Amino acid sequence: MRSKFDQQLAALNQELTEMGATCAQAIGLAAQALEQQDVALAAPVGQLEEQTNEQERTIEALCLKLLLQQQPVARDLRQISAALKMITDMERIGDQAADIAEIIPFFLSHNTFDCTLVCRMAQQASSMVTQSVDAFVRRDVYLARSVAGQDDLVDEDFTAVK
């Protein structure tokens, strides 16, 4: 029974890793389109956002299946609960990447816009998504804390952009 549960947890980790990669790709494309002033580069971001939505539904269903069929306790329950929180955040990140891609024509029409900070924020956010999922899958508390510390840098850049 436990081996089946472990296999399902491994599948959950794989799905989370794939969703994280999709989010990172969406952020990267939006930033690249902005940096290179090329609206066409941002076109796939909407599809990636839809993919992120689908991945959220898939992972949510997997988590609910684990909760209902396996009735996990303690550490396993916390892992599934954390996964549910992560997918909500990653889905929102996908939405925000799509929003950035959507407003790129506006940014490009204002020649005074400097994308340096936004592009740096995107690069940091993309890296943070990847590292967060990695920390979760490997159960690496130190990496998770490191990612949390990086959030302050993104916040500083965001304040400067506003």
What residue ranges belong to the model's regions?
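Cytosolic, long alpha-helical scaffolding segments
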Residues: M1-K162
